Amino acid sequence: MLARSRFILVLVVGALLAVLSFSLQYLHLIPTNPVAEQRSAGRSRKRVNPVLHTDPPAPDPIRDTHQYCNYPNLTEHGWEGHCPPDYKLLSVQVMIRHGDRFPLYSIPKTKKPTIDCILSEKRKPSHPLLASFISHMALGGRGHWDASLGSLPRLPSHSTCEMGELTQTGVVRQLKNGDHLRQAYISRHNLLAADWLPRQLWAETTGKSRTLQSGLAFLFGFLPHFDWSRLTVRQQWSTLFCGQSCDCPARNRYLDQEQRRQYRQRIADAELERTYVTMAKTLGVATKTLRAANPVDALLCHFCHGLPFPCSSTQTSSNAPDEGACLTLEHFAVIRRQQKDDELERREAGLYRRYAVLAAHPYLNRSAARLERIARGSQMRKSKEDAVFALASAHDVTMAPLLSALGLEGAGFPKFAARLVFELWSSPETKERRSDRKLDNMFIRVLYNGEDLTFDTAFCREHNRRSTQPLCPLGNFLSFVRKDMFSVVNATSYQQACHQTVL
């Protein structure tokens, strides 16, 4: 009897479930054939992850400024010295921007930032080579100095920094950069032997103490305790490093046009104008006076050194100044935002690129000629005939047009202690290559702050990286420097481009 009751109960429950299932299907509350519906959605049953289309993050002027400061406590990384196996490093040409410096301008009615420019290994930031670097600079009289460089101080020397003076932060950053390239080129590739010859090292700088001192700090990191008697430091009289080829009227006209574009862009920026008015009112000066003082230069120094932004020095109270009488991070962010906007507009306008091609050509031409001599000397088994390592210690106004001329406008404005590197490599020679004097086995790499940008350059953007030769042929660079780069200004040579009419 009990078993019969259980059987009847099971039948009733089963019937109820059947009716419920039929009802749901009839009312389309569940799919009748989920597998078939899945198949009808597409031929492939492979799971496809959804692609989220999100807008790129908005530019952050404060984050970008941290990168510009180039703090020396950041670990140095880079792809310098990396190449396929069996390739040989023949030469390295480096341009650096000077390191962190004291402002070139002062903001009216504010106190200058208090920064000690006398070097001390006991003060941060420091470096294991700093103490020996200080001692080694005292022996600089044994070196060979071009023009007026011998009279410049080889170390920063003021307890309160002077205008434009290199800071200890700048020195330490250059020591680190030089040490990084020492590991990449000397430890790994033996680019310069311990008994290197004077003609194998080329060093040049402008007549500013900050570029001379930056170059010496970099060299000491690269060649610790180098022999002064083997070093000659040459002076470039122009910040463009144009040597004997500085006469270029068209270049100056392009620069005038670009500066007028910059001015129009600034005065059209309503937020920037309101910010200048507010800053001027805060300090009690005329707006045009504040704008002429280029306040971003001094504010960058405060920001990079973690100092409070300047306040009006006309406070009557000896206590801390009122917050309303001080410049703020918000003021600074607006100015930096406008500078980033200007970089984008400058790229679109194209005027700066034309100026840059003519400004950078003399330096690029000398570098190209040096690399070609070294390449041909290597083919003819003539070694140690030219500078296998060349250093140019320069300014932002030197490096910025160089980047633009190379087609690297997206690389950004040169930060403190920025470095631009040209590497010359040779691949293993075949029997066919040994019989001719072509440069088919010579290649170039271009690196900016450690990042390989070779295939972003104008002369190697179209090179097939998946070809039998994964590097950029040196011939591409030589052709670019000697002719192709002038297509931007509708010319075929430097002389023609410099003396044509600019409307």
Curated annotation (Swiss-Prot):
Cytoplasmic topological domain: 1-6
CDD domains: HP_HAP_like
Reactions mediated catalytically: 3-O-[beta-D-GlcA-(1->3)-beta-D-Gal-(1->3)-beta-D-Gal-(1->4)-beta-D-2-O-P-Xyl]-L-seryl-[protein] + H2O = 3-O-(beta-D-GlcA-(1->3)-beta-D-Gal-(1->3)-beta-D-Gal-(1->4)-beta-D-Xyl)-L-seryl-[protein] + phosphate
GO terms classed as biological process: chondroitin sulfate proteoglycan biosynthetic process; glycosaminoglycan biosynthetic process; positive regulation of heparan sulfate proteoglycan biosynthetic process
Keywords of this entry: Glycoprotein, Golgi apparatus, Hydrolase, Membrane, Signal-anchor, Transmembrane, Transmembrane helix
Superkingdom: Eukaryota
Main localisation: Golgi
InterPro entries: Acid_Pase_AS, His_Pase_clade-2, His_PPase_superfam, Histidine_acid_phosphatase
Region (Disordered): 38-63
Cell compartments where the protein resides: Golgi apparatus membrane
Record-linked Pfam families: His_Phos_2
Topology relative to the membrane: Single-pass type II membrane protein
Top enzyme class: hydrolase
Family (UniProt): Belongs to the histidine acid phosphatase family.
Protein's name in the database: 2-phosphoxylose phosphatase 1
Record lineage: Eukaryota, Metazoa, Chordata, Craniata, Vertebrata
Encoding gene (name): pxylp1
